[in-house]
UniProtKB/Swiss-Prot annotation:
Membrane keyword on record: yes
Keywords: Ammonia transport, Membrane, Transmembrane, Transmembrane helix, Transport
Transmembrane portions of the chain: 41-61, 76-96, 122-142, 150-170, 194-214, 238-258, 277-299, 307-327, 329-349, 362-382, 414-434
Primary gene name: AMT1-3
Organism: Oryza sativa subsp. japonica (Rice)
Subcellular location as annotated: Membrane
A single cellular component GO annotation: plasma membrane
Main location: membrane
Function recorded in the entry: Ammonium transporter probably involved in ammonium uptake from the soil.
InterPro entries: Ammonium/urea_transptr (IPR029020), Ammonium_transpt (IPR001905), Ammonium_transpt_CS (IPR018047), NH4_transpt_AmtB-like_dom (IPR024041)
Descriptive protein name: Ammonium transporter 1 member 3
GO biological process: ammonium homeostasis; ammonium transmembrane transport
Length: 498
């Protein structure tokens, strides 16, 4: 590809100082391109961070009213604690190079930042991803977990567990990263987990799986005979609001994972650039979620006989979780297949959870772990060669099995699923078990029955009227009683006042 200097040289005609002039102009273009890319990444980070509001609304609507304030507070805690611990340790473990492929060891407390390839905008973007994983887990253990346990697990997940996984698959020297610059690629391919079906969703889902399993189901979720007792969330409106906020944020989550937008593929002046890939990624994301929502709508109608908005919202999010790995390397038609299958994966996981008496109030484990795992496999089947080579910059890479690319990518992705499940189980499973053994994980039965809001947070999240309104109403009623003429039954019948 011709450089800026090569293109400008002939235009300047070899005039005096033409080289200096060309250098100046090219540097200005480079600065502008860097500014555009930084703005794009920051805007994407803001969108991903806005997903925390979506998580909060979705969680609040999916639990009972007596626990709504508790679950919203945990979402605030995930963001706040995650910011501190990802700043101190997490970013260093995730992207500190050089390393031996397992864990980073530079940038603790953002020391030596910024430098080439790692600026503050990149830290902000990655922090927003880290707290998304923690938010997934909080939904699985809702309505029965001590608030102190949230603080402990959130700090551990965002500061250590999640960063190690992201180093493996996203760092430039991670042992399984498709973008690895030093050392051999896993199966000569590396793992293509573009925006985190495995790194974010499978990690958060497996962590939630262990938390919910060790805690056990909520009181009353299953009766003495083992039959399921419905515990519906208190607000479908909040669920829908949260779902749309998450959909909006996913346009930063998936397309934003390019981290730049001004990169050119091929010769300058063509339409073949990263901006086109960004647009295609947004399309595949929307299609996968939309098809999953429609499939869930009619699938649940067929199974249960009614239309359920909460099921549709979860199906939509399941499609998003699945397409996240391969959103940049598959065609739009393939994303339709991804969404269709992800809906049935979610329905099947929900059926299995009831059989096993597994209680996840938000279906977070089924949605993020189940659909995330499917998304990893889907990418290994449908990744297109041209997109893989353009995005990862190396010709001859393995690509999707169904697209003629062989089985190397599929083998790498199976390894990804296995190591994530093993790592998160060993770390988060152990943490939840230790908290359980020391009585720090689950609230008392009395607290759970009464509700987390009145027992732990000073009152209910919803108040019909405040104390001042009650006093005004009582005073008005008393004054009315004093001035209103009273009638005896006989006088009332005769139309006379006392």
């Amino acid at each position: 590809m011709a450089t800026c200097l090569d293109s400008l040289g002939p235009l300047l005609g070899g005039a005096a100082n033409s080289t200096d002039a060309a250098n100046y102009i090219c540097n200005r273009f480079t600065d502008t391109s860097s500014a555009v890319d930084a703005t794009y990444l920051l805007f994407s980070a803001y969108l991903v961070f806005a997903m925390q509001l979506g998580f909060a609304m979705l969680c609040a609507g999916s639990v009972r009213a007596k626990n709504s304030m508790n679950i919203m507070l945990t979402n605030v805690l995930d963001a706040a604690a995650g910011a501190l611990f990802y700043y101190l340790f997490g970013f260093a473990f995730a992207f500190g190079t050089p390393s031996k492929g397992f864990i980073g060891k530079q940038f603790f407390g953002l020391k030596h930042m910024p430098q080439t390839g790692y600026d503050y905008d990149f830290f902000l973007f990655q922090w927003a991803f880290a707290i998304a994983a923690a938010g997934i887990t909080s939904g699985s253990i809702a309505e029965r977990t001590r608030f102190s346990a949230y603080l402990i697990y959130s700090a551990f997940l965002t500061g250590f567990v999640y960063p190690v996984v992201s180093h493996w698959f996203w760092s430039t020297d991670g042992w399984a990263s498709a973008g690895r610059l030093t050392g051999p690629l896993l199966f000569k391919s590396g793992v293509i987990d573009f925006a985190g079906s495995g790194v974010v969703h499978l990690v958060g889902g497996i962590a939630g799986l262990w938390g919910a399993f060790i805690e056990g189901p909520r009181i009353g979720r299953f009766d003495a005979a083992g039959r399921t007792v419905a515990m519906k969330g208190h607000s479908a409106s909040l669920v829908v609001l949260g779902t749309f906020l998450l959909w909006f944020g996913w346009f930063g989550f998936n397309p934003g994972s390019f981290t730049t937008i001004s990169k050119i593929y091929g010769e300058s002046g063509t339409i073949d650039g990263q901006w086109s890939a960004v647009g295609r990624t947004a399309v595949t994301t929307s299609l996968a979620g939309s098809v999953a929502a429609l499939t869930t709508l009619y699938g649940k109608r067929w199974l249960t006989g009614h239309w359920n908005v909460t099921d549709v919202c979860n199906g939509l999010l399941g499609g998003f979780a699945a397409i996240t790995a391969g959103c940049s390397v598959v065609d739009p038609w393939a994303s339709v297949i991804c969404g269709f299958v992800s809906a049935w994966v979610l329905i099947g996981c929900n059926k299995l959870s009831l059989i096993l008496k597994f209680d996840d109030p938000l279906e977070a484990t089924q949605l993020h772990a189940g659909c995330g795992a499917w998304g990893i496999i889907f990418t290994a089947l449908f990744a297109r060669r041209e997109y893989v080579e353009l995005i990862y910059g190396v010709p001859g890479r393995p690509y999707g099995l169904f697209m003629g690319g062989g089985g190397r990518l599929l083998a790498a992705h199976i390894v990804q699923i296995l190591v994530i499940v093993g790592w998160v189980s060993a770390t988060m499973g152990t943490l939840f078990y230790v908290l359980h053994r020391f009585g720090l994980l689950r609230v008392s039965p009395a607290t759970e029955m009464e509700g987390m809001d009145p027992t732990c947070h000073g009152g209910f999240g919803y108040v019909d009227e405040d104390e001042g309104e009650r006093r005004v109403r009582a005073k008005s009623a008393a004054e009315t009683a004093r001035v209103e003429p009273r009638k005896s039954p006989e006088q009332a019948a005769a139309g006379q006042f006392v």
